[in-house]
Amino acid sequence: MALHEAGHVISAMLMGCNLSSVELCAQGFTIDLDRSASGYKNIVILTSGPLINLLCSLFFIILFQNSDSYFVSFNLSFGLFNLIPLKFLDGGRLLEEILDICLPTDLASRICSVTNTVLLLITWCFSIYCFLFENTHSSSMFICIFTLINLCLDK
């Protein structure tokens, strides 16, 4: 996670943006920028965290070709997971920034809300199916509940 957040911080500094806060929360760290960052700067900053994870995975795949490295798996999974367009992940904030550039703000917000709801519903149904029929653990159901609570509290 530290590499991921370092990617955000370094790109923010390179873009001339100041950090207003860094907080440890239930889903990891959150970094808030000052309001000087424009839509395009935010897109670069939001993309840089997952990009660092994906580049680290690629680097270790090339470096240790015959290895089943946990580091590779974690960074690849973490980078891709953060690109899921849920509001509290980089992907959700990225979707919001892109839509804000292309569409009126209220329409962009509605699209993001619908996207969050649909993704949560799909994940919830899939996790229930896996729990009932595939005999897997229920952690994804708890993630859905946690995400839903976060979304409700955020409104």
Feature map (PLM): residue ranges:
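Hydrophobic transmembrane alpha-helices and their immediate loop junctions
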Residues: 1-155
